[in-house]
């Protein structure tokens, strides 16, 4: 851990991230993270969370000094005020509030997610949401700050290894905070968000927030199984989802504002409803949104309401069977509710297929495997949904999104899938169910689920929803959805796909994937997701989630998602996807403003692409829900950092999943490359040393040879000279001389003194030779 801090220290921005976490973990005592962070942490700890958060936010932002961070900074400020005066406007806020209640950290996540959304309003709403979820509002706020920090770090690093390192550092730091804050909830939330954020971070500074939410959800799913132990973790997840919700709302914030306000009353449910409300605006089909809202609200009431009533509805949704039931009712509600009745109905059908997944979900393990089939089945529906449905559904789903009811359509289907991806929770519920599913899963999750979008799937779904929200996009991708279906189940419909993808990977992973699918434009999305929907789902989902929150909040999500997808596809595709997303967003009126944000996100997201590619491998190993969640986060970070982060995760409760994932990351990814490079370097060193040694030996031998040759020539000359000077008698004595060199030499010396000196040495030389 000390190592990690050092690393973090290496990245100044990362340190800032730590501070945010400290604030979050303040409950715990500012664990001494890094000294720099510590000072901040101390301030935060001394101050109330909100205050510390505001203070932290500013300083952190400053430290991180990433343009994105600055934006976040503003957002953070807004967030803090939001905290003071909660703006329930955003469904995200509502979700955040619900999440906060569910989990202290949850709210923070929401805030963070909001920050990721980039929409300052979102941040403000998130802050307010956090406040509404007072119990966890404080913690959640710090997480939000953390997320922004992460984002900032990411942005600062930009693309390239340093960027990765920074992201990693951030992640590790974040995790560290979570650990130190060991607050089960706070810590878990933070950790989850951290994981997500890591991924998001990679994806994009802003993206991180969304991603973190998704990741949390996935984690939640895994935790759901654990429930008792993981409760905190689940809670964190649920919280994250809410934050995601917030993000989603961000886009529609203004739009969904009206919706959001009405929704505020039902915090959790409200959150979902707001989501739907906000989404509807996205869809741009006011009617869609309104009906959606109505439908959503009902659905919300059914399942999302459960969000607020998570416990109660969750009771409903909680039981796997109920989940299924809920999903159906939700789907039904969505169907009737959504303005796009047809699309909703289609989606409804789609969600229903998910319902089975919901059933499966209850058994997360089998649910996942089973999910795929359902997803596949869903996929067809997706195509059935087609874009038209998708579009209509999208708007409806977007509108419904909150509830998941509308979303149920595309999003819902997606959410459902995402929910299903969330194994137990979202799936059964389906979009709305997501909310319900979430309830099913953990109470905390329920809120997220309520967010519906929030659910892991939801986060992803949220992403997907955001896409759905952007009917144009979906429409543009109408072919996309169908095509997606053709692709892996994950790929399938952007939204539906999400669920499918989500379930397949690990729950967490799946959500990611599902998100990815939706976000990814039809072409890229299809190929990317097809090629590596699961892996992509993981990192891309994170990215997408980031984008998704943005997308919903800012429509950035689409771009982000594409990016994440692209990231899987790799940067090459990314640009294209990003462009497509941008175009789509542009086509969509609401999204346009967010588009700029998205554009910013994109670059950030791109760097993560490589990570995403790496992730695919991770995905497989990370099948466990928690693992997938963590894996998402880890993949995002640089390979080098991954290993350390692995150590970190190991230290933490999530450590097992994380560990396996981390190991995986190390094995597949930059880690291997780094090892190879080092081996090569070592070999080169050995070669150079050997070459030097050989050369030296050769030189020495050459010199010796030269000396010997010279001596030989000298002796020959002397011999010739002696022969010429000698007389017959002496020559006749040569044989005797050879026999008796001593005598001969004496004679020679007497005869010719000059040769004498040379000759005696000669003889010894000869003998020696």
Swiss-Prot record:
Start-end of Pro residues biased regions: 754-763
Acidic residues bias (residue ranges): 28-37
Keyword Coiled coil: yes
Protein's UniProt keywords contain Ribonucleoprotein: no
Gene Ontology biological process terms, A to Z: negative regulation of cell cycle; regulation of transcription by RNA polymerase II; response to osmotic stress
SUPFAM superfamilies xref list: Delta-sleep-inducing peptide immunoreactive peptide
Tissue-by-tissue expression: Expressed in the cortex, medulla and papilla of the kidney.
Region named Disordered: 20-86, 224-292, 334-353, 520-563, 726-769
PANTHER family for this protein: TSC22 DOMAIN FAMILY PROTEIN 2 (PTHR46894:SF1)
Sequence similarity: Belongs to the TSC-22/Dip/Bun family.
This protein's name: TSC22 domain family protein 2
Organism expressing this protein natively: Mus musculus
Record gene name: Tsc22d2
């Amino acid at each position: 851990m000390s190592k990690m801090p050092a690393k973090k220290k290496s990245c100044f921005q990362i340190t800032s991230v730590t501070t945010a976490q400290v604030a979050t973990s303040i409950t715990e005592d500012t664990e001494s993270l890094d000294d720099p962070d510590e000072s901040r942490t101390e301030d935060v700890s001394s101050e109330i969370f909100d205050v510390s958060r505001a203070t932290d936010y500013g300083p952190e932002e400053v430290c991180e000094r990433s343009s994105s961070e600055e934006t976040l900074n503003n957002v953070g400020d807004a967030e803090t005020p939001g905290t003071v005066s909660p703006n329930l406007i955003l469904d995200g806020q509502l979700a955040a509030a619900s999440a906060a209640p569910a989990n202290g950290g949850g709210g923070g996540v929401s805030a963070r997610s909001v920050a990721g959304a980039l929409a300052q309003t979102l941040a403000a709403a998130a802050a307010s949401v956090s406040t509404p979820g007072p119990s966890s509002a404080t913690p959640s706020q710090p997480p939000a700050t953390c997320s922004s920090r992460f984002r900032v770090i990411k942005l600062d690093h930009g693309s390239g290894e340093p960027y990765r390192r920074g992201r990693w550092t951030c992640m590790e730091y974040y995790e560290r905070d979570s650990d130190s804050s060991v607050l089960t909830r706070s810590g878990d939330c933070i950790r989850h968000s951290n994981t997500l954020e890591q991924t998001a971070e990679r994806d994009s500074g802003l993206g991180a927030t969304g991603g973190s939410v998704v990741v949390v959800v996935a984690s939640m799913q895994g935790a759901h199984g654990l429930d008792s132990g993981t409760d905190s973790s689940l809670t964190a997840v649920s919280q994250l989802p809410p934050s995601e919700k917030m993000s989603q709302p961000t886009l529609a914030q203004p739009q969904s504002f009206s919706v959001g306000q009405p929704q505020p009353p039902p915090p959790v449910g409200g959150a979902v409803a707001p989501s739907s409300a906000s989404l509807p605006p996205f869809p741009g089909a006011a009617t869609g949104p309104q009906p959606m809202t109505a439908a959503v609200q009902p659905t919300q009431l059914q399942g999302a309401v459960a969000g607020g009533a998570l416990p109660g509805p969750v009771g409903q949704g909680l039981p796997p069977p109920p989940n299924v039931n809920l999903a159906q009712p939700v789907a039904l509600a969505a169907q009737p509710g959504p303005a796009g009745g047809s699309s909703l109905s289609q989606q409804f059908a789609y969600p229903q297929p998910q319902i089975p997944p919901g059933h499966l979900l209850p058994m997360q393990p089998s649910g996942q495997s089973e999910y795929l089939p359902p997803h596949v089945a869903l996929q067809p529906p997706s195509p059935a949904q087609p874009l038209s449905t998708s579009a209509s559904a999208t708007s409806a789903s977007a509108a419904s999104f909150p509830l998941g009811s509308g979303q149920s359509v595309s999003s819902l289907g997606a959410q459902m899938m995402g929910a299903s991806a969330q194994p137990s929770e979202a799936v059964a519920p389906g979009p709305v169910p997501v909310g319900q599913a979430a309830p099913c899963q953990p109470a905390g999750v329920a809120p997220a689920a309520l967010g519906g979008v929030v659910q892991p799937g939801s986060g992803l779904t949220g992403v997907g929803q955001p896409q759905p929200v952007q009917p144009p996009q979906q429409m543009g991708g109408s072919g996309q959805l169908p095509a997606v279906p053709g692709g892996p189940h994950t790929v399938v419909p952007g939204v539906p796909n999400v669920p499918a993808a989500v379930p397949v990977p690990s729950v967490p992973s799946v959500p990611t994937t599902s998100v990815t699918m939706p976000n990814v434009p039809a072409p890229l999305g299809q190929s990317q997701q097809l090629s590596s929907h699961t892996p992509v789902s993981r990192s891309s989902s994170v990215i997408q989630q980031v984008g998704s929150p943005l997308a919903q909040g800012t429509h950035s999500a689409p771009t982000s998602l594409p990016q994440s997808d692209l990231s899987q596809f790799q940067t090459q595709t990314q640009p294209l996807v990003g462009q497509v997303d941008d175009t789509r967003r542009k086509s969509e009126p609401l999204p346009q403003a967010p588009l700029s944000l998205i554009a910013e996100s994109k670059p950030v997201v791109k760097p993560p692409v490589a990570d995403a590619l790496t992730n695919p491998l991770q995905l497989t190993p990370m099948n466990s829900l928690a693992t997938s969640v963590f894996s998402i986060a880890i993949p995002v970070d640089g390979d080098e950092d991954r290993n350390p982060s692995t150590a970190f995760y190991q230290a933490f409760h999530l450590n097992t999943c994380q560990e396996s994932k981390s190991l995986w990351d190390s094995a597949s990814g930059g880690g291997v490359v780094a090892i190879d490079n080092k081996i090569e370097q070592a070999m080169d060193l050995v070669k150079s040393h050997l070459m030097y040694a050989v050369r030296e030996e050769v030189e020495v031998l050459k010199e010796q040879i030269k000396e010997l040759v010279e001596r030989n020539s000298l002796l020959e000359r002397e011999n010739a000279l002696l022969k010429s000077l000698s007389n017959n008698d002496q020559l006749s004595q040569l044989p005797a001389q050879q026999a008796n060199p001593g005598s001969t030499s004496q004679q020679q010396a007497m005869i010719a003194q000059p040769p004498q000196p040379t000759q005696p040495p000669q003889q010894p030389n000869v003998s020696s030779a």
